[in-house]
Amino acid sequence: MKALLDLFKQATHEEEFDAIKIGLASPDKIRSWSYGEVKKPETINYRTFKPERDGLFCAKIFGPVKDYECLCGKYKRLKHRGVICEKCGVEVTLSKVRRERMGHIELASPVAHIWFLKSLPSRLGMVLDMTLRDIERVLYFEGFVVVEPGMTPLNRGQLLTEEDYLGKLEEYGDEFKALMGAEGVRELLRSLDVASEVETLHSEISKTGSDTKLKKLSKRLKILEGFQKSGIKPEWMILEVLPVLPPELRPLVPLDGGRFATSDLNDLYRRVINRNNRLKRLLELKAPEIIVRNEKRMLQEAVDSLLDNGRRGKAMTGANKRPLKSLADMIKGKSGRFRQNLLGKRVDYSGRSVIVVGPTLKLHQCGLPKKMALELFKPFIFNRLEVLGLATTIKAAKKMVEDEEPIVWDLLEEVIREHPVMLNRAPTLHRLGIQAFEPVLIEGKAIQLHPLVCAAFNADFDGDQMAVHVPLSLEAQAEARTLMLASNNVLSPANGEPIIVPSQDIVLGLYYMTREKVNAKGEGMMFADVTEARRAYDNREAELHARVTVRIKEVTLDENKNRVETVKRVETTLGRALLSEILPPGLPFSFVDKALKKKEISKLINASFRRCGLRETVIFADKLMYTGFTFATRAGMSIAIKDMLIPQEKGQILGAAEAEVKEIESQYTSGLVTQGERYNKVVDIWGRAGDAVAKAMMGQLGGEKVTDRQGKEVTQESFNAIYMMADSGARGSAAQIRQLAGMRGLMAKPDGSIIETPITANFREGLNMLQYFISTHGARKGLADTALKTANSGYLTRRLVDVTQDLVVTEDDCGTKNGLLVKALVEGGEVVEALRERILGRVAASDIINPETQETVFEAGTLLSEDVVDTIEALGIDEVRVRTPLTCETRYGLCANCYGRDLGRGYLVNVGEAVGVIAAQSIGEPGTQLTMRTFHIGGAASRAAAASQLEAKSNGAVQYTATMRYVTNARKELVAISRSGEILIADDSGRERERHKVPYGATLMVTDGAKIKAGAVLATWDPHTRPIITEYAGRVRFENVEEGVTVAKQVDDVTGLSTLVVIDPKRKSTSTKGVRPQVKLLDDAGNELKIAGTDTLVNITFQIGSIITVKDGQDVAVGDVLARIPQETSKTRDITGGLPRVAELFEARSPKDAGVLAEVTGTVSFGKDTKGKQRLVITDLDGVAHEYLITKEKHVTAHDGQIVQKGEMIVDGPVDPHDILRLQGVEALASYITDEVQDVYRLQGVKINDKHIEVIVRQMLRRVVVADPGDTGLIPGEQVERSEVLQINDEMIAAGKEPAVYDPILLGITKASLSTDSFISAASFQETTRVLTEAAIMGKKDELRGLKENVIVGRLIPAGSGLAYHNTRRRQAAGEDMGADRLLEGGETPAAENQEVA
């Protein structure tokens, strides 16, 4: 009996482990795993269905087919456990050992493992230092390889063809040894002395100068060092014994009709065994060499196919001509082991059904059909039936439930009470896609869902289905209740704003009841309180929209959160007075004393959350919903065709536009404008006309004339149903109404370009055939786009999750002093994002100081909550240094202070929160709303490009930035000669209000320090040409300005004036390739001018295309224009927008023609040009020259003698993020990526908090490249995890040795995911074969730190309560005896309900 109990104990005990290691198995190891050799290719006997002995399913090797029963039937039952039957040789045990016992095949000739041969870069090739082609020739018997040269002049590893070999054999006899096939390669590997190779490589690396050689050597060194560290012998890459998978994992199932369904692996193994046995026989028979060779080659190919079919040559096919699924195919790809079975399991205790709306539910409830609940909660009901003694056995209980006896329903109610269930709607794009609810039993078969959570699930009721899951254990129930209950998830984790916001009908109802109407019934009445007002409304004495006076009780909270009641008389509308009844205590009436549109309601809920806490807000949201539905019903909104009012002015607007277009057409025919200009102008005209019609239409829809009580005619906001729906934000938008009642406007072709004939009709008038046809273009493109977009967006999310999945908050504070300086985001003089929005919920990194009194207002380490931010704003502080995930110094994970507030909860983030995954979801979830296309600059965009002046938008004082340089010309105008100068405008307290870039050659209209009013012009310039301006006065002397060589004379047809234009050097004769036309300046004595204080000559070079405006010998003053460059040369670049742009940024791709940034701070000069390239030299402060070769077409923004800062752009073009990191550092890179990503999302109106993007940038920066290894034994140029280097450096410093010096390096998200420390995570992401091959050779150890690895091995994830569990487990493993009270340290913070919201 004891034995039996032990058996059960052993089944439930789970393995505890801290890491998983992967390596190469030696032949002896493989034999030790095996329970016997598979000698025959037979599987099972087709008549008896019993496995054949020594075959692929042999019971003697793999174990019995039935539990505790040997094959011949001599021993049956449990009492013979462990006996080995002497007749059939089968051990009597459980049949499930057939899932774990392996066999093996002794190969007659060694075989190379294809992964180490063909998975690039070829590991075999790297170890042997031979090319893949050569090794393949040896392996597949096309050539010999010299293994031992002996005393001959041959080299080890040299290849010989058959003839060579025979010739050498005659020449040297058996002095040398050469082999072919895997034996040859095995001997080479066996004779490799790893230790001495490593030493020689180390010395070679220190000697070598060339980069390519260094790369090659360090790669090889890395592999050999991996062998050394992990104790793996290189010859194990060649298989001598092949393991055989347990038979239950490659099943053979008899179908009816005598056929068998089998796993492809059986076919592949059969081929290997057949060829192996044939080879053995040939060797015994001493067959001719050529036949044996052929058989060996076939064996090699058979093993290749088994391991990775199709990797080399044609894939082996089965009877039905499809390629067989090999071992490698089993684990890789979407339907492989990792993604299909380990990361995506099916779950029991779950069901799915269609959803319908549940407007009577409370926020934390969902309606669950009784039938479904009965099935889901079966075990709980069985338990109750037994406990209450209503059923004696489970079997009896089962019968009662199946017969649906009345008592069962009562018990179901009892079981379900307080037992939350989880609802999930696919696709689950963010964590709010699964939420917990308390079930309410309902009749019918559909699940009822609360309307307010639809936004989070992105659910609607047009046939959507949802899945229900039951959390079983008490811990699971507790977590579902405290963390996942819908009423605990009011805020969106992406931006911290409420996600439980009324929409559609509810908004319409609330909007309708808070609107006011002139001269409504009951206008001017007075009410003692709201109840009296309600009576008047119920008795139809007063309308909802009437202006009335009501006494309203207002409850506010003072500083100590005590309730203060005040009663005041307000003049308001009856509807708003009714609405005031449901306000939570703490919100003043002023919040609802206006027409409530969707935005206002969102603000209302936000304010309620911040002031009154979570509980009150949830109750309030529910009440809002009930009220909204009630009054939407009362309103009885309806729309008719007549509601779509077509504006009277439409005809004349269209007429004017047509006239303008005719005018442009005639200009075009007479050759005044080009085809491109004509197209742009026409599109522009129609765009403006469409806007004008829309404006007229909204004006007409939005107002109506009525008579007031005095009999005067007044205009009030319209009660037109269509207008109200759009205005309230319930449904529809101005753009859609414009198509119904205005004009449809311009349409796009499928390639994204705009068709220049607009659709002037609208849907109310109806479209003619041509118009309808043009419309269909856009609609179809939209559908095609959506399909593509979903896939792309999903893939982006997957990559983001993969790169951040191991980032968890692991400690409270890392103690770093670093942070990010944040100021308001200003673009083109307009504040795009205010400072408060950017710092809210962060932790201050340094003290915040009052700019006027210089005293500390908030100390470093303060969480910047709403109140703090309000104070900061009031004090006029315009930049704050905050903690950021980028500079967090926690080794593995993040600290709570660097992350700041948990946006979905409203207080400082808990230890154990998986912030990486949340960041990935927040960025990926709106992905489907982004556009897919690249925009062509055309129409409206080109109009914006031709700006010619800067205007101030606010009052204040002008400040020039340090980069601004200017000269005063003869007309006493200030002319800017810097390219990166900016004008700031600061208010009285010195805060920056706006900033503007000033282009080169602009005339500055204001001086530094001047006080200006809003609307003042700051600078003007000619938008069509770019000047070349002299900074010095003197007499012009041309050099290399030769007509027909470097310049061409152009005569204007109309005016007859001639100008000199610098021509492209491509058209010059070869002798003048290196000359560039330039100007030297002479002083009065005729000497060449030098730049003040230096020996450098003033020399101004003309660019290609410049029109020279001065004559040789002319005197010029400072600030005069020497030449103009027409602006038409600037090509319009396509802007990559939407999803592709976000992916491009996160993948850290270098743009095509990237701009060049200065590597050092120094002075610019131009060197001698080469063919097609110009040479730019920057001489740094120590006098070292740095050269750049730049193609002639590129526009160099720096000019001769200019002093540039390190990281400043000197050649125009898009920036390469890698350059920003290298030259300007991590902060600049982070702000670049953040701003660029935010631009894309902002365009679509999506709000995402910056910190999510920073979290991802942190993960992109997690590797460093070793610059100087010190005493660490790392290799220069090697990429290592930052945490690993820090660890090694700590050890070095402790030992008093030299630590390594390293530089940060930026990896794209795919690269970063694949290069993570965890090989399990990387293998389950992409390129499984490559990752596993590399890991096996290096003998890698996976510490199971991330979430994904732990899910794959089936443990709790190290986040949330799982973090506490793992910490405890590790401490116990370390032998610490822990008190129960300390068990939960470092785990969850108490539930949201017991926490006051900050």
Swiss-Prot record:
Cofactor list: Mg(2+); Zn(2+)
Biological process according to GO: DNA-templated transcription
Metal-binding in keyword set: yes
Top-rank lineage group of the source organism: Bacteria
Cross-referenced SMART domains: RPOLA_N
Binding locations of Zn(2+) 2: 814, 888, 895, 898
EC annotation from Swiss-Prot or TrEMBL: 2.7.7.6
Cofactor, free-text remark: Binds 1 Mg(2+) ion per subunit.
GO molecular function: DNA binding; DNA-directed RNA polymerase activity; magnesium ion binding; zinc ion binding
Catalytic activity: RNA(n) + a ribonucleoside 5'-triphosphate = RNA(n+1) + diphosphate
Protein purpose: DNA-dependent RNA polymerase catalyzes the transcription of DNA into RNA using the four ribonucleoside triphosphates as substrates.
Protein name: DNA-directed RNA polymerase subunit beta'
Organism, as annotated: Thiobacillus denitrificans (strain ATCC 25259 / T1)
Gene of this entry: rpoC
